[in-house]
Amino acid sequence: MTAEITAFGTTASGEPVEAITLRAGDLTAVVLTWGAVLQDVRLAGVPYSLTQGSDLVSDYEDKMRYHGSLIGPVVNRITGARAVIAGHEYEFEHSMYGAVTLHCGSNGTHVKLWDIVAADASSVTLAIDLPHGEGGFPGNRQIAVRFWIEAPASLRMEVTGTTDADTILNFANHSYWNLDGTPCWDGHTLQIKADHYLPATEIFTPTGEIAAVEGTAYDLRKPRVITVNNPPLDNCYCLGRERVALRDVLTLTGTSGVEMIMATTEPGLQAYDGRHAIRPGKAAYEGLAFEPEFWPDATNHPEFPSIDLADGDTYHQLTEWRFTKP
């Protein structure tokens, strides 16, 4: 079957953005060429989107620039906006608190147009080239992401990347989820299969401690109803120390009974409660973000799993979301 590709809008600079609608089984998803955004996810019989999006490109260029996007080349924080890569020091954009690089700032893949490489009724592959030196990062990098749906209601995302010089890569989808379609996610049940997490500083960078969740508010190893600030979430959960085969790491269940199981190959999962992720006309805590990735600020913590990618090597991430309803 042919792909369903439609005009979505134009950027502030006049570039056209397209929307690709994927369908299979009970699931429908919409992916944008802007930022490789996962704009809409719908489960048959549920009268609202499970992820939070917008119908306006201008929102994704502004306050919603992280909503649903694929963030890279390095997601999350880099303390001091600097890193040593293959013995050379590089400096990046100071995009947060004047001393931290957050989501690669104005050069991230979430604020770029991607090219459609292939598409059919249930899948799309997008690609983008990142030139050497852009944002301070070394290497000419070729990045591709494939989204596809498998019946009955599974959405998968595969990210690959190569470079012609030693560099660092760490991508994550940054979708916000609310399985009830309500103004606040309060009352969802959450389980994260992690024994440890990374405590954060006042500017939300890792302290360097790898802390046990046991005995803390961050212990989500068993399903638990969460509420706003219980716990306050903007931390990375440590799922392991290396990329592994796809395995289930998270279960989120709304009061509606709609359930999402997330699986990933990645060793970390940044959980964020959406306190500052406010869509136009909406309020804080509308959705929960779960970002499968390597641990944040890894370049400044040699004890963390490495995000180095050498010339000739290939970056490869696989993440899956599976949905059910009562």
Predicted ranges, named:
Residues M1-P326:
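An exposed, glycine/acidic-rich loop-and-rim segment of catalytic or binding clefts
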